[in-house]
Amino acid sequence: MILPTNFFVTTIILLFILIFLASAIKIVKEYERAVIFRLGRVVGARGPGLFFIIPIFEKAVIVDLRTQVLDVPVQETITKDNVPVRVNAVVYFRVVDPVKAVTQVKNYIMATSQISQTTLRSVIGQAHLDELLSERDKLNMQLQRIIDEATDPWGIKVTAVEIKDVELPAGMQRAMAKQAEAERERRARITLAEAERQAAEKLREAAEIISEHPMALQLRTLQTISDVASDKSNVIVLMLPMEMLKLFKSLSDAAQVYAKKEKEKEKE
């Protein structure tokens, strides 16, 4: 009976040693750190790699140092100009001090989520609707700064905050659609008015030129008649003013005088 008893005791001792070694050996990945507690007191952070702790007397809490993505659930709030909105966001953060993340707050992920929700409601409540829709980058930076300052004592670094979706009441959406349509019509009217102004300016310049050179209008009229007459299918009926007839007579007389001078030169 002595042999079985010794075998049983040896087995128990070996099993205890294996359990002791399994509890003493710790392997921490490259992106992790182990916060070591000895008899309830923090003695520091270890890792990455292999290390040993004293079971029963020491305890290791593993902390992930990678950037984590935290979805902030939809928050219902009212903007500064009294427009009810539903907004959600996403927060990117990482642990930079694992000891603080373990000792300064019970659950740093939940705490970061809660502070992100309250900050989102606060910032949106201080902004106008136009800012929320058109200056989202500015609000993102403001959110990132406030949340980062609030979580800094926990060893957390907030790297970015992005507002994802902004939901407006149906009535507000229709009103904004009408406003956008009115804005497009206003711009179209401004463009048309500018074109008419430029056309009027050109007409004014032309009128000034014609008033300074009356013959220019008559020559332009003759050019137009010539262009129309080039098409043989057109039948032209002209009601010419006296000034135009006088112009024709002057041109005819000038042509006759010129022809007479040419003949005299030939005789000489």
From Swiss-Prot:
The keyword Transmembrane helix applies. Keywords: Coiled coil, Membrane, Transmembrane, Transmembrane helix. The keyword Coiled coil applies. It is found in: Membrane. It comes from the Archaea. Residues 125-152, 178-213 form a coiled coil. Its main location: membrane. The chain crosses the membrane at residues 1-21. PROSITE patterns: BAND_7. GO terms for cellular component: plasma membrane. It is a single-pass membrane protein. InterPro entries: Band-7_stomatin-like, Band_7, Band_7/SPFH_dom_sf, Band_7/stomatin-like_CS, Stomatin_HflK_fam. It holds the Pfam family Band_7. Homotrimer. Belongs to the band 7/mec-2 family. PANTHER family: AT06885P-RELATED, BAND 7 PROTEIN-RELATED. This is Stomatin homolog PYRAB06580. It comes from Pyrococcus abyssi (strain GE5 / Orsay).
